[in-house]
Amino acid sequence: GGVRRSNERCFREVIGKLTTSLLYVNKDAFFDGNKIFLEDVNGCTICLSCGAASENTDPMVIIEVNKNGKTVTDKVDRERFWNVCRMLKLMSKHNIQQPDSLITEGGFLNLRGVNLANKNFQGEDLSEIDASNADFRETNLSNVNLVGANLCCANLHSVNLMGSNMTKANLTHADLTCANMSGVNLTAAILFGSDLTDTKLNGAKLDKIALTLAKSLTGADLTGSQHTPTPLPDYNDRTLFPHPIF
C-alpha cells in the first residue's frame, strides 16, 4: 500500500509539472526540437524530446530520466504522447475531471461520459476526442474543430455549434435538440438515430451524409444548407451502437 501511494504521488507530480510546462511549449515547437524539462521529480530530472522518424518506425518521443548522474531512457509514440498533452491542457484550462485514463485504447482523448455542461470551448481543437455519452448541455462549441470526434450518444441539447467543423464526426444517437448548428460542416458525419428536433442547420454543409437515418428532423431549420445525400453503405438499422445513458 505504501509503495502504491508513493507511486501515485510521483505520478501526480509528473502530471502537474508536465501540465505547467505545456503552458510554454506548443506542438509545433516541440516537434521542431524544443525540449521539455521536468525538474525535481522525486529527486529526478526528466527530459522529453522529439526524435526523428526512421525508415521502419514512426517519430517517437524520447524520455530521459536522470538521477545522481545515472540516466534511464525510454521512447513512446509521438502522436499518442501529444494527445496526452492535449488532454492535460484541456483538463487544466476547462477544469475537467477525468478519473479514468487520459487516452482511450484507440488513441483518442478520453472524455467518455464526462460532464461538460455549460462550458466554453469556443475555438478549441477537439478533433479525435471520444466524448461518447458525455454531457454537453448548453455548452459553447462554436468554431471548434471536431473532425473525427466520437459524440455517440452525447447530450448536445441547446449547444452552440455555429461554424464548427464536424467532418466525419460520429453523432450516432446524439441528442441535438434545440442546438444551433448554423454554418456547421457535417461532411461525411454519421447521424444514425440522432435527434435533430428544432435544430438550426441553416447554412450547414451536409455533404455525404444520410439525413434519412436521423431519428427526427421535426422543426429543424435547413434553410440554405448544402445537402448531397450519399449514405454510407456500412450503416443500417442492424448496426450495433451504444445506448444513451441520459
Question: Predicted regions: what is each one?
Answer:
Residues 14-19, 46-48, 63, 81-89, ...:
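Extended low-polarity, hydrophobic cluster-rich segments
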Residues 1-45:
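A surface-exposed partner-binding patch
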Residues 49-53:
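Short beta-strand micro-motifs enriched in acidic
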